[in-house]
C-alpha cells in the first residue's frame, strides 16, 4: 500500500482545491484504494479541511504563522517574492517533520507555493515529490521571467508531474521529467445525472457564468458581449465568489450590469451549482487567457446545458466546436456576441449541442483519473526505491 500525502497552501474552495477533493474521494471510493492510501495536509485552515474530512480522507492542518495571501503572483516585487519564498521554505521544514512522522511514501504538491514547501519537506523525509500542476506555467499568468524560473524549479525538485490537461502539460515544457495527464473529471458512478429543464424559446432563455469573480475569468467581457446580443435572455446568473482583495471586481461587475441594464443575479459562491445548471439553457465560460482545464465546462456539458467556451486552453480538449458546444477566442467580445446570438436564436441547435455534450462529458470520469494517478504514484515510488536520485535533473 502506497501512502500518498497531498499538500495545498490554501484551504479555500477554488478550482484546484475542489479538483483535489474529487480526486482523493475517487481514489478512496474505487479499486485504487487497494494500492494507494491518500491523505491531505493544508498549511492553513479553511472550508476545504472539513470538506475533505467529510469524505473520510485523513486531513490535517500544519500549524504555522505564514499567510499565503501575503505572497501573490501579480503586484508583488521581487524582494517581496523572495521574502515569501523564504517563509515557504521554513514551513516546508516543519512539513517534512510531519510527513516523516506520518510515514508517507510520496508527496504531491498541488500549487507552486506548495511545490516550494514540499521540495524542502520531501528532501527532509527522503521521499519522492510529485508536482500536481493545475495552472498553465505561462507568461500571461506568471510573467515571462517567473514562469521560466518556475519551470526550472519544477524540473530541479520534482521527481515527476501530474498535469490537468495537455494544455497545461505543454506549458511545463517537461523534457524528460516523467508525468501523466489526469483530467479533473466528475463523479459519474457515485452521483446520478440530474434532469435538465427543456431548452426555452429565445426571449425566455437563462444564461449562467460559473467561476470565481476575478478579471482573468472575463465576466466583464461576457456582460459587454451580451449587451450587444440581438435578443436578451430572461435571466442571467453570475455564480462565484471572491477571495481576499478581489471584492472590488464584483462591485465593478454589479455596476456594469446595472449600466448595461442586464437582468443579472449575483449568487456568490455555491458549493454545488447543479441546481442552477439544471435550469440553465446556455452556460458561458469566458476566460480571457488560456484556461488550464475548465472544470465548469464539463459540469455544464453533463448538466445538459448548451456550452460556449473560450480557446486556447483546456476547453479545446473538452469541446469540438459545433459538435459538443461552441468555442470562441479568449477575450474576443465580437466572437462571443456572435456565439450568443447563434445559440439564443436557435433552440434546435441548443438541443443538439446539449445532447452531444452529455455524451462527451462521460469521457471525463474522475474514476479514470484516480486509476491514472494511483498507477503513476506507485510507479514513481518503485522507481525511487531502486534509483534514489531519479527525477532530480534539469
Language-model-detected regions and their locations in the chain:
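A conserved mid-protein helix/loop that constitutes part of the nucleotide-sugar donor-binding site
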Residues: 17-25, 205, 209-228, 248, ...
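Glycosyltransferase donor-sugar binding loop
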Residues: 40-46, 210, 235-251, 266
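Short acidic/histidine- and often glycine-rich active-site loop of Leloir-type glycosyltransferases
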Residues: 52, 311-322, 326-327
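Nucleotide-activated donor-binding/catalytic signature segment of Leloir-type glycosyltransferases, i.e.
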Residues: 59, 250-270
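Donor nucleotide-sugar binding/catalytic pocket of nucleotide-sugar-dependent glycosyltransferases
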Residues: 60-63, 155-193
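Short His-centered aromatic/hydrophobic patch
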Residues: 109-115, 133
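Short hydrophobic beta-strand element within catalytic cores of glycosyltransferases
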Residues: 306-309
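Conserved acidic donor-binding segment of nucleotide-sugar-dependent glycosyltransferases
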Residues: 321-322, 326-334, 342-348, 362
Amino acid at each position: 500500500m502506497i501512502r500518498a500525502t497531498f499538500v495545498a497552501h490554501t484551504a479555500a474552495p477554488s478550482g484546484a482545491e475542489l479538483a483535489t477533493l474529487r480526486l482523493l474521494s475517487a481514489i478512496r471510493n474505487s479499486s485504487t484504494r487497494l494500492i494507494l492510501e491518500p491523505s491531505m495536509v493544508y498549511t492553513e485552515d479553511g472550508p476545504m479541511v472539513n470538506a475533505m474530512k467529510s469524505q473520510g480522507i485523513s486531513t490535517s492542518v500544519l500549524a504555522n504563522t505564514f499567510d499565503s495571501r501575503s505572497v501573490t503572483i501579480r503586484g508583488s516585487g521581487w524582494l517581496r517574492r523572495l521574502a515569501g519564498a523564504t517563509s515557504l521554505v521554513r514551513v516546508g521544514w516543519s512539513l517534512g517533520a510531519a510527513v516523516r512522522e506520518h510515514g508517507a511514501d510520496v508527496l504531491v504538491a498541488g500549487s507552486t507555493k506548495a511545490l516550494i514547501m514540499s521540495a524542502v519537506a520531501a528532501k527532509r523525509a527522503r521521499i519522492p515529490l510529485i508536482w500536481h500542476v493545475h495552472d498553465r506555467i505561462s507568461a500571461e499568468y506568471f510573467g515571462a521571467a517567473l514562469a521560466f524560473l518556475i519551470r526550472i524549479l519544477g524540473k530541479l525538485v520534482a521527481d515527476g508531474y501530474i498535469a490537468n490537461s495537455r494544455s497545461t502539460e505543454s506549458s511545463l515544457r517537461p523534457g524528460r521529467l516523467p508525468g501523466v495527464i489526469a483530467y479533473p473529471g466528475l463523479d459519474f458512478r457515485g452521483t446520478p445525472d440530474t434532469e435538465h429543464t427543456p431548452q426555452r424559446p429565445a426571449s425566455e432563455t437563462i444564461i449562467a457564468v460559473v467561476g470565481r469573480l476575478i478579471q482573468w475569468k472575463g465576466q466583464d467581457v461576457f456582460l459587454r458581449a451580451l449587451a450587444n446580443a440581438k435578443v436578451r435572455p430572461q435571466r442571467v446568473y453570475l455564480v462565484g465568489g471572491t477571495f481576499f482583495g478581489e471584492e472590488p471586481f464584483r462591485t465593478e461587475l454589479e455596476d456594469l450590469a446595472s449600466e448595461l441594464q442586464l437582468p443579472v443575479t449575483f449568487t456568490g459562491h455555491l458549493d454545488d451549482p447543479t441546481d442552477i445548471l439544471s435550469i440553465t439553457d446556455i452556460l458561458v465560460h469566458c476566460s480571457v487567457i488560456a484556461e488550464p482545464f475548465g472544470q465548469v465546462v464539463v459540469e455544464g456539458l453533463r448538466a445538459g446545458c448548451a456550452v460556449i467556451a473560450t480557446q486556447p486552453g483546456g476547453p479545446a480538449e473538452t469541446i469540438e466546436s459545433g459538435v459538443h458546444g461552441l468555442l470562441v477566442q479568449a477575450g474576443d467580445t465580437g466572437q462571443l456576441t456572435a456565439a450568443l446570438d447563434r445559440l439564443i436564436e436557435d433552440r434546435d441547435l441548443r438541443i443538439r449541442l446539449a445532447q452531444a455534450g452529455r455524451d462527451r462529458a462521460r469521457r471525463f470520469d474522475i474514476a479514470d483519473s484516480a486509476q491514472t494517478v494511483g498507477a503513476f504514484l506507485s510507479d514513481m515510488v518503485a522507481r525511487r526505491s531502486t534509483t534514489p536520485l531519479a527525477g532530480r535533473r534539469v
